[in-house]
Amino acid sequence: GYFYNYAFLYNDTLYSICTGELNEFLIYTADTDGMNRKLAFTAELSLCTMVNPVLDGGRLFFVGSEFEMNDTDSVGLRENYSLCSVDLSDFSFEKYMDIGTANETVIGKKSLLLYKNKIYFQHSEYSENSVHSAVECYDIDGSERMTVLEMEDSVNVWQCNGGKMLYVVSDDDDSHSQVCSYDLDGGGTEVLFKRDGYVSDVCMIGNRVFYMYSTADGKSEIRSAGVFDTSDGKDLTTEFDGDVYVSVLGHTSNGHLIHYQDSERDSFGLLSDEDFWSLKFENADFKFEQ
């Protein structure tokens, strides 16, 4: 048996990324109708599913995971992360470099970015009383590695938008956040806005930023969504009744593809541009539920 992790369409071929019985990394290919399915690639290392893989120029970049015995650890196993790629034209595999271990390096869904033939990787290291976060830049051939951004705070990267890297800086107890933009071409950081609570799922389209955030009232966590307009500073928010999660998956000429999850449903649907910026998620045309 195996588990499906991701699926995507590229050059009229359907690709599915799976984890096998031994946690090995597998890629299956099929026609666009799902027929003629076959195993195209397998690797002994595992896919780190905490980080979304990135497709660029026919090459799939991902974070690989391997376990080794560790006599200094009470658990006896150490999970090592590495930066890898698979060329979809011939399924050649390349492992670029080691990038940390699971017990010392914290990474997120959008930690891996590609821009102008360079790979950007965001990670954080936590100790008992401090946190250190960094964004490193690698040449796509792995020949050079440099740090472009680092700070003693918790950082999560969420998007690369036209050469601007959007990220959130949070304090130790997640009670305050600031949403920032870093210029990948010229350097320099701009603070777009600040908000009480923990901000996540940041997505910038044009001058407007969609985001999720959570605050605590002492008894429970309050989940909300917001839209911040960088052109005039206006901030529209809506508070959810219960534990609700919304993320933006993509955009079409007809609207925005969203993932909506609460205690009763786990759904994917298309939301019109007007309803999206008005935060009227109940108007989405949900096509698929898990």
Where would I find each of the regions flagged by the language model?
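Short loop/turn segments that connect beta-strands within beta-propeller blades
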Residues: D31-M35, V86-F91, D139-S143, D183-G187, ...
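N-terminal "mature head" segments of proteins
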Residues: G1-C48, G57, M97, E104-T105, ...
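A short beta-strand motif characteristic of beta-propeller blades
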Residues: G1, N36-A43, S92-N103, E144-E150, ...
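Solenoidal tandem-repeat scaffolds enriched in leucines and small polar residues
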Residues: E79-Y81, V86, F91-D141, V148-M151, ...
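Structural motif
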Residues: L22-Y28, E68-S85, H123, S127-C137, ...
